[in-house]
Amino acid sequence: TFGGGLKSFDDSRVRKLPGVRKVLRVGEDAVAVVAETWWQAKTALDALPIVWDRGDNVQVDSASIEAMLDEGLSAKEAFVGNQVGDVKRAIADADRIVEATYRYPFQNHATMEPMNATARWTEERCEVWCPTQNGEAALQAVAKAAGLPANRCEVYKIHLGGGFGRRGAFHDFAEQAVRIAKQMPGTPIKLLWTREEDMLHGHYHPITKARMVGGLDAAGRLTGLHIRISGQSILAAVNPAWMRNGVDMFTFQGLL
């Protein structure tokens, strides 16, 4: 669950498996197995007993999210993205009124290439080889995880197997690689998520619901249109400074 964390793990058996170098805690919400090969690491991780704290969002499910969206559509107040003329009167005076509700679900970016990065950390410098859509954002994330100033960190942008925004807005995978490398100074660490990890721990396209009410004249021409949107903001998480008067222009422009 989002907001969950790591309680504990028992690596007494796993660290003795072939190829395993270390079993490490990574931040507050992940465990990594460092091994000679990726398959050895995955096999060991699958066998590792882990206790998770599922956090405050454990009760959140599809039904509760749907209820929040409906509540937003029915709320008395809302931020106004665009208003031209008196739409309420235009619809009230229409010969015919058409209403429709549309829904866009959460969707995983599902890039062809799962999240990955390679990192090498020393007390003097941190280097990261990272498939990224935003080198500046990647550098900021790497510097934060490395505990070093940005001018002592290098991010090498490499070819990526699909991005779709997932590798531009968030660099949690690069941060994880650095946090692992920081516990093994001087050792290059290649982090590669499994497809299952990539699907479960993605940052999804926001869920949105829109209610549209249109007024038509006797000839079927549109005389008024009112659109109400309820959903998760894109910019509030990615770049809140771009929000204007409570309006997420990415969501608003996508609707238009």
Annotate the PLM regions:
Residues 1-256:
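Structural alpha/beta core scaffold segments of enzyme domains
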